[in-house]
Amino acid sequence: MKKIKVIKLRTVCTDKATELPGTLTHWMYNMGGSVDYLFQPKGLNEEGQPVKKLYLEAERLEVGPEDFEEVEVPDEILGTQVTDDASGFTGMAISFMRHVNGCFHVFIQPKGLNKKEGAPIQRNDFDLRGCSGKMISKLSELELKKSEAAVPSPEPATFEREPASEDLPGKHF
């Protein structure tokens, strides 16, 4: 486990570049050790839907020292082979996402190309509690039930799936 300093989720802040106010709903921690935040600007578009989210680094956000917290991430899992037990989806653990409710997902990137499209196989995210791998400690059945009751997992399909080559921090959702 590695301790990292992050901005608390649900923090209301302003993006310095766009000057838009909004709320932090997720953060992602990658293999390089950097953190990006999913920023939901306040407001609705012409169709009455929320304005598209932005991935932003901490330096773009107007926040104070009280908005930070220290959390532990299982850094040792990144770069290792991981499998989602329910689907069998297997690949390298490339990043983590913390949801606003506290649930922790791992992004898995398989090897190879999608034969139909000739593009890298799309990465997918899964609740870490439902995955296995050499560096993942399994919870007992009782621990799992308690954890899921305290921090239920949102559906991984919360985010639009895009080819890995287009799915970079800083991209609008």
What label would you give each PLM region?
Residues G64-T80, D85, T90-H99, R129-F173:
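Long, low-complexity intrinsically disordered regions
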Residues K2-K3, K8, V12-R60, E72, ...:
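Basic/aromatic-rich interaction segments and small domains that mediate binding to polyanionic partners
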